[in-house]
A protein has these predicted regions:
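Membrane-embedded catalytic cores of phosphoryl/pyrophosphoryl-handling enzymes
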Residues: 2-4, 9, 129-244
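Hydrophobic alpha-helical bundle signature of multipass membrane enzymes
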Residues: 2-155, 168-178, 188-190
């Protein structure tokens, strides 16, 4: 077993705890109103969506370069590895979303509460979908304005979760790189961040637990492959001092 395999598996299982628990108890999303903790989750979810995901991506890249790159060539390879990981995950997301066409939880709730058929909702263009949400929900006290704004920006299909693919891929990659090199605190921090993103996607009515589970597993497989290749190609310089 490679040195990165065990920590990635453990981190994956930790990330799967919330969606598996939600799936087992049969929890169904319902509007929760205006709560500070829910708005905090909204800001956490923004770290893995446009435009803030670009800043997070740059932060992760900078961290990798500072920790592991001992030459310009090594830095370029590290950046290419992360780009390949994220682009592959997002490519899978686009392909599967357009194939399965699973409605988001909030769209299913909209159908039950306002009799807007999910099929009819998704027949509209994205701009028209946002207009439908505005028309029906602008006066609904159960939906905070920030949540409505978030929904209007994300009116696509649910399965799989692009936010989860982004957060889980980055966090698992860093765990695979950091944990074997005794960077335990950083490994825990990125895992907690990713878990926050996963929980936020369910709490905000954006994804079903099975979306989160599948996306996390896809990320884990991709990260395993990437870590195997980096070890095979000796991309990471183990002689660099990483002790904390």
């Amino acid at each position: 077993m490679n040195q990165f395999t065990k920590p990635i598996i453990i981190a994956t299982l930790i990330l799967l705890l919330p969606p598996v628990a939600v799936l087992m108890v049969g929890w169904q999303w319902q509007p929760m109103g205006e709560y500070l903790w829910l708005e905090i989750l909204y800001w956490i979810t923004n770290t893995s969506g446009k435009p803030w995901c670009y800043l997070v991506f740059l932060f992760f890249i900078l961290g990798l370069l500072l920790l592991f790159a001992t030459s310009a060539r090594q830095g370029v390879i590290l950046v290419a590895i992360v780009m390949m990981l994220l682009l592959t995950g997002q490519g899978i997301k686009v392909l599967v979303k357009n194939t399965t066409k699973e409605p988001r939880p909030y769209v299913v709730w909209l159908e039950k509460s306002y009799r807007v058929p999910t099929g009819e909702f998704y027949q509209h263009q994205r701009k028209q979908r946002a207009e439908v949400l505005q028309r029906y929900l602008k006066a609904d006290d159960r939906i905070p304005q920030w949540q409505l704004t978030h929904w209007k920006r994300e009116t696509g299909y649910a399965f799989p979760s692009g936010h989860t693919l982004f957060a889980a891929s980055l966090s698992l990659l860093l765990v695979g790189f950091l944990w074997p090199r005794r960077r335990y605190i950083l490994s825990i921090i990125v895992t907690v961040w990713a878990m926050g993103v996963l929980i936020s996607r369910m709490a905000l009515g954006m994804h079903w637990p099975q979306d989160i589970i599948t996306s996390t597993l896809i990320s884990a497989v991709l990260v395993m492959v990437i870590c195997y290749l980096t070890e095979k190609w000796r991309v990471i310089d183990d002689k660099k001092d990483l002790a904390v």
